[in-house]
Design a protein with these regions (language model features):
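Phosphate-ester processing/binding pockets and catalytic centers
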Residues: 2-268
Length: 268
């Protein structure tokens, strides 16, 4: 989730559109990153976002989870509903904890037919007339700040026309890559290092996509370091943020209680 004051959105969207034109690409998406051309285009968007974040004009918050942890490793898991619940977790966390629960919010998610955004909006507004365990993600803190914020709209946006949707896709994809392909990134780092291993291990085969995505992840880490954004890569969990209040926050979700389980499909 990239969040900022409304008047900035049009400005940043316009700048990303210009950057893409200069790079001769129609759209930047993490999964499309397989060439130097796309890499350079994505790095320009990363630079732009970090430039605004560095002067506290936008936030970048990403939620990552392990589909094999105790919460998600359940029989009959409803992946669509689980994704929706995680969106709710992220929205609640950013609005209440990072923006202190204030403001009138317009939310523009990338088009995703899996998510019922009207339902998400209704849950966030607490106006659903039927039971839904997604509601459990809105805790006492959310209700405490309910009078201070208003969610006026949740409207899907076409990422081809909306640069900020491309930007959050890049940061989200990069964060997920850092966890799911952490062994590949570690192997890539070893190959780039001039130091020889004392105890060589079996090498992992790296695809062209692994190499390009690892290059961008490393580039982003270097750029954040120059701006004193304290995010690091850890071998067991990927990108890690120690201070969630800083302008770029990668939140690795862990089960909150023993009863914290992903939703199960109906009639399973």
């Amino acid at each position: 989730m990239i969040s900022m004051r409304a008047e900035l959105a049009e400005e940043i969207n316009g700048k990303i559109q210009i950057l893409n034109q200069e790079s001769d690409v129609k759209e930047c998406k993490w999964y499309k990153l397989e060439s130097a051309k796309n890499r350079f285009a994505i790095q320009k968007i990363i630079d732009l976002c970090l430039e605004y974040a560095d002067i506290d004009r936008l936030r970048i918050d990403v939620l990552v989870w392990d589909s094999e942890d105790s919460r998600h490793k359940v029989i009959g898991r409803d992946d669509n509903k689980n994704l929706m619940n995680m969106y709710i977790q992220l929205l609640k966390n950013v609005i209440v904890k990072r923006w202190k629960g204030s403001g009138v919010w317009q939310i523009f998610p990338d088009q995703n037919s899996i998510i019922d955004w009207v339902h998400v909006r209704n849950i966030l507004r607490k106006i659903d007339l039927y039971d839904d365990d997604s509601d459990s993600y809105l805790d006492r803190t959310w209700n405490q700040f309910k009078s201070l914020h208003s969610i006026v709209s949740v409207e899907e946006a076409d990422s081809k026309l909306t640069g900020l949707c491309q930007a959050i896709d890049i940061f989200t994809g990069m964060s997920v890559f850092s966890f799911e392909k952490r062994e590949a990134f570690t192997e890539w780092g070893k190959r780039k290092s001039p130091q020889q291993e004392l105890f060589p291990t079996e090498k992992i085969e790296l695809s062209n996509k692994d190499n390009e995505q690892s290059t961008v992840l490393n580039y982003c880490l270097e750029q954040m370091a120059t701006k004193n954004i304290n995010i690091r890569f850890e071998n067991n969990s990927g990108l890690v943020t120690k201070d969630p209040n800083q302008v770029v926050n990668v939140w690795f979700y862990t089960p909150q209680t023993l009863s914290d389980k992903a939703p199960i499909r109906d009639n399973f």
